[in-house]
Design a protein with these regions (language model features):
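Class I SAM-dependent transferase core
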Residues: 2-40
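Conserved SAM/SAH cofactor-binding pocket of Class I
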Residues: 35-84
Length: 84
């Protein structure tokens, strides 16, 4: 595994994700947003500035709809894709 990556879990879930040590990382704000988000069963979720895809992973617990992540950093998009 790339030594820039860590393998962490999303608090309050049994979901794990990769995070880069040199990029923005999931934090308490992410966990709170993920916990309190309201997503219906077939909703499409768009996360602008998705970074590692953590919020999309939280959303995946609620919807069978599309999960779309957008980020300006190519590396962030690649990491989100790996996590999803």
């Amino acid at each position: 595994m790339d030594n820039r990556l860590s393998f962490d879990y999303l608090p309050g879930t049994d979901i794990y994700l990769y995070q880069r040590r040199d990029m923005f990382r999931m934090n308490t704000d992410t966990a709170l947003l993920g916990h309190f988000m309201r997503v219906r069963e077939n909703d499409t979720v768009l996360d602008i500035g998705c970074n590692n895809g953590a919020l999309l992973l939280y959303a995946s617990r609620y919807t069978k709809g599309r999960l779309i992540g957008v980020d300006i950093q190519k590396e962030a998009c690649e990491l989100a894709e790996k996590n999803l």
